[in-house]
Amino acid sequence: MIREINVSEITAAIKEMCIQANHFLSPDMDKALKAATANEESPLGKKILNQLQENLKIAGEDMIPICQDTGMAVFFIEIGQDVHFTGGVLEDAINEGVRQGYTDGYLRKSVVKDPLIRENTKDNTPAVIHYSIVSGD
């Protein structure tokens, strides 16, 4: 049975992922940071870890990026061999989601078209995309 996914769903999900990833830590990373802070013996180290936690709190509450360098968008895509994308091209949908996420999330645009010319794309595309085809849908 073929499963159909409209690429507009991919664009919306990528947009939200870009914004969320730059404003919040995943629960496992948050837990690891809290554990590191609790276990840190150095007063300076503990102070720095507490500052990181305060930064995360502010980022989440005020919806500002955790770090001013919001990086490149890198995706590892597993596509079931029984999936068919409709409404456009998957790669275009991913890049449009990145474009919307970095624009609407007010994230720093730092990707260049050509590393020698250094011309900024002004929307952080293209994303780095790794594809794997897997069984199922």
Name these PLM-found stretches.
Residues 1-137:
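Non-transmembrane, aqueous-exposed alpha-helical and coiled segments at domain scale
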